[in-house]
Every structure is written in C-alpha cells, then in structure tokens.
Amino acid sequence: MKIGKFKIGKPNVFVIAEIGNNHNGSLQLALEMVDAAIDAGADCVKFQMRNMASVYRKKSLDKQGEDLGTEYILDLLQRFQLSTDEHREVAEYCTSKGILYMCTPWDSSSVDTLEKFKIPAYKVASADLTNLPLIDHLVTTKKPLILSTGMSTESEIQVTVDFLNKREASYVLLHCNSTYPAPFHDINLNW
C-alpha cells in the first residue's frame, strides 16, 4: 500500500507522530508539535476531527448527561479541538514542511470536511473499528485506511476485514493496545 510517497510494508517503516488532540485546541501548539515530529524524523503527523453533534447525543452535549464523567470528557473534547480552518492551516503547514498530514475522522461529516483537504489516507480509531457505516463512508473516498484494533476481539477484527475485502478497500491493520502503559502480557505483538 502507498500513502503519499511512502510504500507501506516490509521492509519500510512508516512513522506516524500521533498528535491527536494533544495541542489542547491551540493552533500554535499544533504547529510546534508538527515541527517536533519533523525533528524526530516522523513521516506523518496525525490529528483528530469530530463533529460533536454527529458523534454525541444532544442530551450529553447540553450538559444533561447521566454522569459527570461524560460531561467532563465532552467539555475537554469541545475545548481541545481545532476548527476546520485551523485543521486546514495545519494541513497546509505540513505540506510546506514536507510531512504528511493525516487525520482520524470520528464521523461522516468530518470525512466530508477532510476530503476537501486532499489528504492521502485516513486513520480509523480503535473505537470505530466496528463502526461499519463510518468505514463504508471512508471506503468511498478510495483513500488507504489504517485501522487500529485496540479493545477489539478477534471476531470483531475479522468482521471488519471481511467488510473491507468485500469492498476491495486498500487498508492495513494497526496493532493497538488501549492501555497505557501496556502490561507486557497484553502487548501480543505475535498475533
């Protein structure tokens, strides 16, 4: 599989610097993190985009969620995301610096927004490995997909693999452990 100018697979390693939402909603910090990724030798930087109204229930977004944990997390997600224009600026900055910009869309409307950026590939979060409607929407872009498998059972992974194969999608699975730091007995790199 190819992503941009990079051929993915043996013997080549494709290094993705996971920025996610660690920029805390600051465009300046996001750009500084891109520079740090370049200095570290990364091939790609990866961000996240979500349309909060598409992903979360209105009740939760209106601060009427059933628990404080949900309210706390949603508040952080809202405060720590970049706007569409800021994502576009980061993508353009990456192009000017010679590093690939990639993003994890959490919903179909984010996919549609990101398609305007002409990004080379999409990353699917572990939490969305079984979100077949989202994956189907991503497949229609004809872009390569990198899908994380954290928290998924072998049968869930197989369902998604069969789904992608049936659609002749270009994809790779990214072995992912969703516990940080991961206990050695959970690493399972030989699967």
What are these regions (language model features)?
Residues 1-191:
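Catalytic cores and adjacent flexible loops of soluble metabolic enzymes
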